[in-house]
Amino acid sequence: LNSFLSLNIENGILKVEAMPPSTHPELKPAVLLCIDDNEDVLECEKSFLESFGYTVLTAATGSKGLELASMHSVDLVIVDYFMPEMNGHEVAIAMRRLRPKAPIIMLSGALDVPEQALKWVDAFIAKDRLASQLLPVITQLRGCECLTPHSYEA
């Protein structure tokens, strides 16, 4: 790859910037599923992660994300918390039943995500920290099946 992309959020606007490849470690190829009701965020996540060699599936709703996870082998899931129809908590519960070994990263622009929702995921990233934390968290989670043990009780 000739360059990598960096995601930055400034004044609520997601920006994509090219960066030299030498600033990022090589990551293992994997299939990632991104679920977010904001199409612009999905496109930025997809471009960013594909620049590192990941195969990225995207879904604008929780039900579409679950449908994709049932049809494809998914190695890791990235889901927004605040979405219409199904929120990230509901998606995480269903995803754990569908893909119990796939780590789940929850994203949110707000920090008031209920503790109960966080029990179903392996990591939480505030959207304003996405640029600096997404790749390190993916790298850590890809090195193990789950970051912490789960009881998976609703």
Give, region by region, the residue ranges found by the protein language model:
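Non-catalytic signal-transmission and effector/linker regions of two-component phosphorelay proteins
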Residues: 1-31, 130-154
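Conserved acidic segment of CheY-like receiver
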Residues: 28-40, 45-49, 77
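Helix N-cap/capping motif at the beta->alpha junctions
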Residues: 58-67, 88
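Short amphipathic alpha-helix used as the core "switch/output" element in two-component signaling
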Residues: 67, 89-100
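His-Asp phosphorelay/catalytic-motif detector in bacterial-type signaling
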Residues: 73-75, 99-103
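Active-site residues of response regulator receiver
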Residues: 80
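Receiver (REC) domain active-site loop signature in two-component systems and cognate sites
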Residues: 83
